[in-house]
């Protein structure tokens, strides 16, 4: 029999600084790009996106990446430091645009933490939906608005449900790992809690 031990795992949210200016520039880059609709339908996936550059997620030479990656990294570094780490390493960075009826079904990511930056988000568009780790038959969402970044553990099952809005939804997503623990925690000798059998 598998014994469960509940531990706290955090999901973080923060506004992206200068979102309006950043949004305008990013959308121009994507409009000028040659990315195409993204569709997967098999025994596992049934995803449909208006546009995405996911197949190029580890290519750091894309024009929008050269513009966006430094600012995104700075925001992600703040999340990492909030969790007790010194810095963060971006492995993959990509965008997704959802038209009406588009969907990115249940999935997970590789790495330590992933997340979503909501570039365009209508009030009728779905936000990221998560499954509880201790009860995957129940889901939850977080109250967010356009311009928010949400940072969450890669292992949490999540999706973007079908977009019912007539307005497009646009996001940036990433896969990351942490670099080094902050010194204050290395020298710390906390009281140890023993989890019962």
Where are these predicted regions, by residue range?
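Non-heme Fe(II)/2-oxoglutarate
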Residues: 1-85, 103
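A hydrophobic alpha-helix/topogenic segment detector
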Residues: 43, 163-166
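Catalytic core of non-heme Fe(II) oxygenases with the double-stranded beta-helix
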Residues: 87-161, 168-171, 175-189
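Aromatic-enriched
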Residues: 193-197
């Amino acid at each position: 029999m598998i014994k469960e031990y509940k531990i706290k795992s955090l999901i973080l949210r923060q506004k992206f600084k200068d979102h309006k200016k950043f949004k305008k520039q990013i959308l121009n880059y994507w409009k000028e790009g040659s990315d195409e609709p993204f569709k997967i339908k098999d025994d596992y996936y049934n995803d449909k996106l208006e546009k995405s550059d996911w197949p190029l997620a580890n290519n750091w030479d894309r024009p929008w990446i050269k513009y966006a990656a430094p600012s995104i990294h700075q925001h992600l570094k703040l999340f990492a430091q909030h969790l007790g780490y010194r810095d963060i390493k971006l492995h993959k960075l990509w965008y997704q645009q959802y038209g009406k009826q588009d969907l990115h079904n249940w999935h997970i990511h590789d790495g330590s933490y992933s997340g979503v930056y909501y570039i365009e988000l209508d009030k009728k568009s779905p936000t990221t939906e998560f499954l509880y780790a201790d009860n995957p038959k129940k889901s939850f969402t977080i109250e967010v608005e356009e311009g928010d970044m949400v940072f969450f553990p890669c292992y949490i099952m999540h999706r973007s449900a079908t977009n019912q809005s007539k307005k497009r939804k646009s996001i940036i997503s990433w896969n990351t790992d942490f670099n080094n623990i902050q010194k204050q925690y290395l020298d710390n000798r906390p009281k140890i809690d023993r989890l019962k059998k």
